[in-house]
């Protein structure tokens, strides 16, 4: 956590954190974990709900899922600055696996519940498979293979560039301009070691770092989500579906094939 926070401080980058409630409420560790999350908010970052136990919506009963979302929101609400010494901010919810239920009924029920709670669905426009790189990276470190860990790190940063090349071009092809990008990352060892390098590369591409609230103020984010599916495709692809534009999902940069074996 400290390495992530330091990298964000170094690049003056605000982060929006999506918390799984049961990972905050741990026997014998709850108070310590709550204090850590509150420190993130004191640093100027925003805390949001990612459910209580990370269920897949399409594989969970609707009532049980909505109860899980509500329970997760209660955990996060208990962490937010009750004294409001920091500015208030909109609350977002990111569905685990970005699984939106797989049916219109479930999708609409979730949106209705979020709207009633004054919580917004959280979009993203790109990711760089960080959780998959993390599997290989952590295994290499556990095996003491520093050379492989370094090679994975380099591939990870190269993947970042490929993902941004694609997302920027897809934005131009969709809107004739570049919309603010929302990068999905996970708190893991890989990013603890390399978030500074990630932010440096984005800064070199000309990006400035803003909150999710600021990014989603762009008119593109008001376009309806054209997908009710179970997979975590980016909102650029979802908007294209809504706008009736050709599917470009198959053009996404592939995950490096050579990494599949080390990650096993």
Give the positions of each predicted feature.
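Generic beta-sheet signal
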Residues: 179-185
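Active-site beta->alpha N-cap acidic-glycine motif
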Residues: 1-98, 103, 183, 201
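Short low-complexity, flexible loop/linker segments enriched in glycine and/or proline
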Residues: 31-33, 63-65, 136-140, 223-228
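A mature extracytoplasmic/lumenal domain signature
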Residues: 19-23, 51-53, 97, 125-128, ...
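C-terminal domain-boundary segment and adjacent tail
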Residues: 15, 25, 123, 189-264
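Glycine-enriched alpha-helix->loop->beta-strand junction motifs that scaffold or abut catalytic
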Residues: 43-47, 115-120
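Alpha-helical scaffold elements lining the catalytic groove of polysaccharide deacetylases
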Residues: 55-81, 103-117, 125-177, 191-194
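Short, basic, helix/turn surface patches
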Residues: 41-49, 73-80, 146-164, 233-255, ...
């Amino acid at each position: 956590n400290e390495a992530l926070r330091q990298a964000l401080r170094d690049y003056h980058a605000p982060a929006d954190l999506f918390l799984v409630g049961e990972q905050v409420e741990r026997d014998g560790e709850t108070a310590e974990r709550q204090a850590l999350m509150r420190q993130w908010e004191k640093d100027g970052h925003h805390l949001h709900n990612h459910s209580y136990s990370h269920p897949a919506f399409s594989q969970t009963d609707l009532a049980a899922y909505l109860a899980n979302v509500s329970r997760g929101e209660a955990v996060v609400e208990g962490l937010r600055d009750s004294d409001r010494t920091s500015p208030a901010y909109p609350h977002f919810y990111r569905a685990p696996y970005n699984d939106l239920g797989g049916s219109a009924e479930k999708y609409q029920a979730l949106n209705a519940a979020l709207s009633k709670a004054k919580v917004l669905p959280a979009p993203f426009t790109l990711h760089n498979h960080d959780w998959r790189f993390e599997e290989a990276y952590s295994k290499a470190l556990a095996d003491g293979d520093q050379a492989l860990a370094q090679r994975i790190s380099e591939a990870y940063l190269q993947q970042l560039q490929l993902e941004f090349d694609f997302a920027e071009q897809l934005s131009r092809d969709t809107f004739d301009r570049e919309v603010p990008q929302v990068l999905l990352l996970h708190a893991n060892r890989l990013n603890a070691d390399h978030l500074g390098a990630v932010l440096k590369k984005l800064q070199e591409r000309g990006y400035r770092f803003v909150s999710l609230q600021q990014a989603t103020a762009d008119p593109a984010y008001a376009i309806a989500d054209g997908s009710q599916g179970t997979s975590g495709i980016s909102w650029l692809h979802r908007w294209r579906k809504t706008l009736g534009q050709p599917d470009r999902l198959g053009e996404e940069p592939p995950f490096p094939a050579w990494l599949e074996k080390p990650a096993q």
